[in-house]
């Protein structure tokens, strides 16, 4: 098992998570005793204890006082916060993960974009006004796109959408910079922003779902043209930190 890590705690965390991912510690199984596991990984028991607590908070493990630590089925117990970890574990499957991520975001964003234009159209107009000074660079578009989604999610009337977006942030920022490196993708997005601005100024939230659906289809087609050339390094947290 080859693991790149910045320190003992990072190494221990990646060792345990990869062992769970590769079914060496399958769901429902009991982890080796703390002393045995610390010797196996090569870290102190104090470091291991901190790592186990962190993994339990993320849903990988179940720790109960006086009982051995049990491995969870992370698909049932973890949240969006492990997306980055899954990308790290399976870079070959990263394009499919991104497909699923973008599909989920498109479906959810149609709800909070409509809610934002209904509940707070002035906020939408204000954030959309920034498109007229937007630099034509991948970084600027990626940052603005996230800002737009975050602002509209917060003003939609349901702040839970913001928490969902936060779970996407790390991966989406990296993928966004790659996606918006295409001038065609930037132009497609800019046209969408302008159409959304027209709706916001007219306080027309009714037509938002249709606009979102059209943009989702067109941006999805654009993504399919770009995904096969995406560098695998985008999947790795260490390479992008």
Curated annotation (Swiss-Prot):
<keyword id="KW-0238">DNA-binding</keyword>
<keyword id="KW-0443">Lipid metabolism</keyword>
<dbReference type="GO" id="GO:0000062">
    <property type="term" value="F:fatty-acyl-CoA binding"/>
</dbReference>
<keyword id="KW-0678">Repressor</keyword>
<keyword id="KW-0805">Transcription regulation</keyword>
<dbReference type="GO" id="GO:0006631">
    <property type="term" value="P:fatty acid metabolic process"/>
</dbReference>
<dbReference type="InterPro" id="IPR000524">
    <property type="entry name" value="Tscrpt_reg_HTH_GntR"/>
</dbReference>
<keyword id="KW-0010">Activator</keyword>
<dbReference type="GO" id="GO:0003677">
    <property type="term" value="F:DNA binding"/>
</dbReference>
<dbReference type="InterPro" id="IPR028374">
    <property type="entry name" value="FadR_C"/>
</dbReference>
<dbReference type="GO" id="GO:0019217">
    <property type="term" value="P:regulation of fatty acid metabolic process"/>
</dbReference>
<feature type="DNA-binding region" description="H-T-H motif">
    <location>
        <begin position="34"/>
        <end position="53"/>
    </location>
</feature>
<dbReference type="InterPro" id="IPR036390">
    <property type="entry name" value="WH_DNA-bd_sf"/>
</dbReference>
<keyword id="KW-0804">Transcription</keyword>
<comment type="subunit">
    <text>Homodimer.</text>
</comment>
<dbReference type="Pfam" id="PF00392">
    <property type="entry name" value="GntR"/>
</dbReference>
<dbReference type="GO" id="GO:0005737">
    <property type="term" value="C:cytoplasm"/>
</dbReference>
<keyword id="KW-0276">Fatty acid metabolism</keyword>
<protein>
    <recommendedName>
        <fullName>Fatty acid metabolism regulator protein</fullName>
    </recommendedName>
</protein>
<feature type="domain" description="HTH gntR-type">
    <location>
        <begin position="6"/>
        <end position="74"/>
    </location>
</feature>
<dbReference type="InterPro" id="IPR014178">
    <property type="entry name" value="FA-response_TF_FadR"/>
</dbReference>
<comment type="function">
    <text>Multifunctional regulator of fatty acid metabolism.</text>
</comment>
<dbReference type="InterPro" id="IPR036388">
    <property type="entry name" value="WH-like_DNA-bd_sf"/>
</dbReference>
<keyword id="KW-0963">Cytoplasm</keyword>
<dbReference type="Pfam" id="PF07840">
    <property type="entry name" value="FadR_C"/>
</dbReference>
<dbReference type="InterPro" id="IPR008920">
    <property type="entry name" value="TF_FadR/GntR_C"/>
</dbReference>
<dbReference type="GO" id="GO:0003700">
    <property type="term" value="F:DNA-binding transcription factor activity"/>
</dbReference>
